Amino acid sequence: MASGREIKSKIKSVQNTRKVTRALEMVSASKIRKAQEQMKISRPYAQAMKQMIGHLAQANTEYLHPFLIAHKQVKRIGYIVISSDRGLAGGLNNNLFRKMLGEMHQWQDNGAEVDIVTIGQKASVFFRRIKVNILGSVTHLGDTPRLEQLIGVIKVMLDAYTEEKLDRVYLVYNHFINTMVQKASFDQLLPLLAAKDKVAHHDWDYLYEPDAATVLEHVMTRYIESLVYQAMLENIASEHAARMVAMKAASDNANKLIGTLQLVYNKARQAAITQEISEIVGGAAAV
C-alpha cells in the first residue's frame, strides 16, 4: 500500500486538476451563451437566403449560373471541413472526423478523388497527418470570427467548382442542437439544390438589374459565404457546449477519485496507527 504522504500528494494533484476543469467549465458556460446569440442572429438571414436561392434555382432565366449546374459525372469531391482550434471538447472533433472518413471512403470506393479545405487547427492537423489533399486552410479565428477571414478558403472551392476541377462541394461541421447534443452535419453546397418548401413546384420569374449574370454572381457567392459563416457559428457553439459537458464530467470524476483516495488514505493512516499501538503494546509486554 502507498504511504500516507504519497496518497496526500495524489489527492493534492487531483484537486489542482479539478480547479482547472471547473474553471474551463465555467468559461465555456459563459461563452456558449454568447455563441448562441451570434448563431440566432445570423440564422434568419441564412434561412431567407437559402429560400431565395432555392427559388432562383428553378427560375425561368436565360442565364444559368455555374453553381446551379450539376456536372454529369462525379469524379472529384470537395469538402469544407470546420473544426475547433483547441481540444478538451470530448469527442466533438473525433466524431466529425470519423464520419468524414466514412464519407470519403465511400466516394473513393466509387472511383472519386477528394480535395478539402480546413477551417480550424484540429482539422488541419488531422487531415495533413493522414495525407488528404488540402487546397487551403485557415486557423485561429477565435470565438468571434469575421466573414472576411473565411472568404479566401471559400473562394478556393468556388473557383475549383466553376473551373470543373470539382464536381460537388460539401460543408462539414458540427450542428448545434442543444447543450447536450451536437450532430455532425454534411450539407451539399454545390451544385445548389432547389427549394424544398411547399412553393417549390412553381416557376419563378425575376427581373434582374443590371442583368442576371451580374446579380446572380454576387448573390450566389454571398449565399455560399453566409452558409459557411453560419456553420462556423454553429460549430463554435457546439465546441463550447461539448467542452462544458466534458469539463463537468472531468470535475465529477475528480470528485469521485478524491473520495476514493481519501478513503485509501484513511485506511492507510488507520493501519499505521494500529501498527504503532501494536508495537507499543508489544514493547511494554516485553519489559
Curated annotation (Swiss-Prot):
UniProt keywords, alphabetically: ATP synthesis, Cell inner membrane, Cell membrane, CF(1), Hydrogen ion transport, Ion transport, Membrane, Transport
Function: Produces ATP from ADP in the presence of a proton gradient across the membrane. The gamma chain is believed to be important in regulating ATPase activity and the flow of protons through the CF(0) complex.
Family the UniProt entry places it in: Belongs to the ATPase gamma chain family.
NCBIfam families: ATPsyn_F1gamma, PRK05621.1-1
Protein name: ATP synthase gamma chain
Pfam families: ATP-synt
Subunit structure: F-type ATPases have 2 components, CF(1) - the catalytic core - and CF(0) - the membrane proton channel. CF(1) has five subunits: alpha(3), beta(3), gamma(1), delta(1), epsilon(1). CF(0) has three main subunits: a, b and c.
Signal peptide: none
Subcellular location field: Cell inner membrane
Transmembrane regions listed in the UniProt entry: none
UniProt topology in membrane: Peripheral membrane protein
Protein's UniProt keywords contain Nucleotide-binding: no
CDD domains: F1-ATPase_gamma (cd12151)
A GO CC term attached to the entry: plasma membrane
Domain of life: Bacteria
HAMAP family for the chain: ATP_synth_gamma_bact
SUPFAM superfamilies reported in the protein's UniProt record: ATP synthase (F1-ATPase), gamma subunit (SSF52943)
Molecular-function GO term, any one: proton-transporting ATP synthase activity, rotational mechanism
